[in-house]
Amino acid sequence: MRPLKLILQAFGPFAGREEIDFTKLGDAPLFLINGATGAGKSSILDAICYALYGETTGSERTGDQMRCDYAAPESLTEVIFEFELAGARYQITRQPDQEIPKKRGEGMTKKSHSATLVALKSDGNELIANKPNPVAKAVVELMGLDVKQFRQVMVLPQGKFRELLTANSKEREQIFGQLFQTQLYSQIERALFERAAGIRKEKEEFDQQIKGTLSVVGLESEEQLQTELTELAPVLTHAQSQLKAEQQQWDETKAHYQAALELEQQFIRKQQLVVEIATHQEQATHIEMLRQQRQQAQKAARLTAVHQQWHQAQKNLQQAKLKVEQQQTLLQQAKAQQQQAQQASQQASLACEEVPKLNEQRITWQRAEQKLLAQENVQQAVAKAERELQLATQNALNLQQASEKLEQELQNQRLEWEQQQRQLTRLEVQKARMNQLVQQVQAREREQSLLNELQTAQQALLRFEQQHHHIQTQAEQAKLTADKLEFAWHTQRAAELALALTQNEPCPVCGSLEHPNKAQYSGDVVTKVQVEQARQQQQDWVQRQQEAFHAWQQQGFKTEQIAQNLTTLSSELTLQQVALLNELIEQQQILHSDIAALQQLNPDLLKRQIEEGEQRLAHTKMTLEKQNQNQQQAWQTLAQLQAELASLRQEIPPELSDLDTLRSAIGRVQNQIEILQKAEHTAREQWVQAQKQFASVQAAYQAAIEAHRESQRQQEETTSAWQQGLLHSGFSDESAYLAARLTDEAIVNIERQIAQYEERSAMLSGEQQALSRKLAEKNRPELEPLLVKVTQAEEKMALALQAFTQHQSRMDGLQRVAKQLADLYQKNRALEAEYQVVGTLSDIANGKTGAKVSLHRFVLGVLLDDVLLQASQRLMKMSRGRYLLKRKEERAKGNVGSGLDLMVEDSYSGKWRDVATLSGGESFMAALSLALGLSDVVQAYSGGIRLDTLFIDEGFGSLDPESLDLAIQTLIDLQQGGRTIGIISHVTELKEQIGLRLDVLATRMGSTLRLIT
């Protein structure tokens, strides 16, 4: 990553908009970021880190805490960082959470954190991400480093340079893994571990399956399974033999019972046949009646055709007679219609004799109509010409007025353009005045803020003072209480000793043999614990008193500092004769309105408008001249049309001068002609049609008479045939015939009943004779004893079957379990063999054996050796041959992973020791060497991550002059190799030796930047 441009606005100590163009420093520059303490040198690194990751280099402050207190309310806190990575250019813009003025009304509103990442291309920018989280992920993917790793390898923040040096193996593994892209080895470790864990899990599942399989049959071990299988085999064989014997006995008993049951059913059937035959013979009379009914129906069936013909002939004769009567009526109607149509046709022909006279009148009126139409066209042309003349006159007048108006507008615009030119000379003066007012307002607001802080601090100081006095009183009270308890305890102890004194024996305290005035105690009993608790409470109150006094004292210092700052600022403002805040704001508003009004001025636009107006004026004058010509032409056209109209009016008679009346008369005549002609044509057609209708009806009448004669003849013939049929069939009349006649279905039904009766008679008789012959020499059996034997045999067989089924089911379950166990043991042996290989590889790859070094750390250890080789060369140079960096090879204690920890060799003592034992300056040189070595090796391996840039924040102040020169020379060598190196320091020697410099200048209204090349 190579920085190209950094823009800061209202960020950190920078109140305004500051821009750093790194390209002006040249390719791979070595430059110094210089400035006083607190000016904002580290804020530049914070801005780069915050733009990329949304976090500052030290992580002590969040984005919303980076807003400059001196920034104008409407100025957004924003960082824009443009950088180059792998030949591609990117720009990232980030704005933290912040309060901004409302667009409408007063007050502030919260603006949420926003971020945008764009790829800068020659053919247009490409948006990569436009929200904080997606931007952070995209930056990690592009850089190959997260924020913590970025701070450790590309930025050595102030006070953080030891972290890269003293990081443990786990932290260094994460950094190197990202830099060298060795995730493949971690994936191998994880894959082996997961595969081994999966095999272990499968093996445990198989063990559980074995236990579960045995538990299904209620056993706990395979020995029990084999024992039961051996013991159950003969028992199952005996049960099977017993079942076969009982089943054979049941079959024989059941066969005997079945034969006796069939014989009993035959005897019962013989008795039933006697009853059924008697019942069947009762239907003989009904069957005979059906036979006679069938015979009569068969006779009637032979007369059916003759009877139908006779009835049809009578029906046809009646229809023919009715037809003759209908046709006779129609013939009379047709003759009357023919006569009426003939009279109507003659009358229509007489009326049509008026048509020629009407046609002549119509033609005369149509000629007059043509002249009136011509006159109307000329009148319309005259009206149009008058309108065109009026329009031309009005247009000429409008153009004349527009021309005069344009000339006046142009004159006004020229005057306004000259006035704007004069006013614009005041804009820069007003802007400068506005900047001065903004600074003065900010200063007055700072003064007001300090005044508020002072009031708040004074109130807090009063609270701290009151709190201190209260706690001091409590501490004094606790001391009095503890003193009283301790005195009472000593008095109590003296009284206890006095009780033990004996006359003429020495006192253990004073040695006297006489004890005239023994100590006495009459108060409450006091224990040593109570005294100690009271003293502890006293100490607690004393501690709280000290803390309260310290807080009071600190608040006093803070209040004094605020008062001093307020006094200094107020004095400066008074010295500069700065107006009061409300006056400044009023002036600012007036000036803002004036500047806004001046910024609205646009003399260039007005100049273009003047030029366009001049072009419009010339065009308007040209159009006016053409319009005058059109007006003259319109006068001539109107005069010609008026003369033509007067001539046409003289040719038309007065009585035909109205066009609508004339057209109405023509229409009436034309309509009358059409009505007469149509009436004649219609009457003639109706007469012809009536003649045709009369002839047709007359022919139909003759045909109806002939059909009636034929129907009468057929009726006579069928009547004779019907009378002969009745005579030969034996029926007395038509009623007797109809009574005997049956439908085909009825006859079929009678024949079916007769056939069924005869078939059943034969069947019952045959079955009775067969049973009589079969049972002639047999006795009727007794079924009850046989049924008892069958039931007993069936019960014995069921018991034998139940016993066999139980034994067989148990045997099947045991054999199934035995087979499942065999399959499980075979699979388990395969898993054990696989785990011997995979498990061993997993333990080795994950660092669970030997030196506790995983495969990933082993690979990184080799890479770290290369890094340390490069780093040691620089460290040897900077430490004047004293120190070398080396990887710690001893195994860490316990289960902690190792393999990437660092040690340093001290050539003065000849011993190796931990890098944490280095001094501040030595640690800085070692960390710098390690960072530079890491940069060399990463770029040499070309793993997709390029460490083209290194920022170092402080640390040079801990070096002596000679070490400082060596460190600078090392950085110069690195810079000549194509690296961009930025150093943040206030060390004077660096300022003298490094020509490229970015100065951070601190002012009362915020810091500014100045690039010196």
UniProtKB/Swiss-Prot annotation:
The keyword Hydrolase applies. The keyword Acyltransferase does not apply. GO terms for cellular component: DNA repair complex. GO terms for molecular function: ATP binding; ATP hydrolysis activity; DNA exonuclease activity; endonuclease activity. Residues 242-262, 281-486, 604-717, 739-838 form a coiled coil. ATP binds at G35, A36, T37, G38, A39, G40, K41, S42. GO terms for biological process: DNA recombination; DNA repair; DNA replication; double-strand break repair. It comes from the Bacteria. Signal peptide: none annotated. Keywords: ATP-binding, Coiled coil, DNA recombination, DNA replication, Endonuclease, Exonuclease, Hydrolase, Nuclease, Nucleotide-binding. SbcCD cleaves DNA hairpin structures. These structures can inhibit DNA replication and are intermediates in certain DNA recombination reactions. The complex acts as a 3'->5' double strand exonuclease that can open hairpins. It also has a 5' single-strand endonuclease activity. Belongs to the SMC family. SbcC subfamily. Heterodimer of SbcC and SbcD. This is Nuclease SbcCD subunit C. The lineage of its organism: Bacteria, Pseudomonadati, Pseudomonadota, Gammaproteobacteria, Vibrionales.
